[in-house]
UniProtKB/Swiss-Prot annotation:
Its main location: mitochondrion. This is ATP synthase subunit a. One of its GO terms (biological process) is proton motive force-driven ATP synthesis. The lineage of its organism: Eukaryota, Viridiplantae, Streptophyta, Embryophyta, Marchantiophyta. The chain crosses the membrane at residues 6-26, 31-51, 88-108, 117-137, 144-164, 190-212, 225-245.
Amino acid sequence: MACSPLEQFAIIQLIPIHIGNLYFSFTNSSLFMLLTISLVLLLVHFVTLNGGNLVPNAWQSFVEMIYDFVLNLVNEQISGASSVKQRFFPLIYVTFTFLLFCNLIGMIPYSFTVTSHFIITLGLSFSLFIGITIVGFQTHGLHFFSILLPQGVPLPLAPFLVLLELISYCFRALSLGIRLFANMMAGHSLVKILSGFAWTMLSMGGILYLGQLAPFFIVFALTGLELGVAILQAYVFTILLCIYLNDAINLH
């Protein structure tokens, strides 16, 4: 298990907490989620302290860049009045920032990638999906069920299409969680495997010492690629969240 590329995803119990038959132990996953939230809050606090700087520094520019990026994303993907967009912007901004920092912190050696665990991504996607569904019913009432039946469908095909649309709608949350988990886990595992291969060749010495340069270059390239994937997956999760929210609000 020591050489397994999956060892990096192991849940380690740090503080055991048992209340009867309930298990609330504080793990490395809990620690890094807490660190992520603390880092984001501290960054935003110091950047916005005293209203921020008239001439922004690097950190303030970084926070403003994320803010403008998410704001443009919301304006492009969610149609309707600006009050509707402002209502859901904080949720989308927090979701994107949390996922982005979780993914980036997972790139640091000896850290833990929170989003590489299916239970985390699935819990996040299902909670958001349930919230979006509630928004749909609050906005449209029972008319929200019309999202399951496209206009102009022949009556004999209606039951079949409603069933297909219902399955498709329910699988949105599942696919949202699987996509993030699978990409983060696969990328980190690949980097770990190639890193171990390059280190083995380096340790053997001799002519293999020169041969290990190619795997090392590949590892560096994959690390850069994985960094891009970490940012991209936070973006994909967020844009799909905006699309699903727009469907619930406008029945598109």
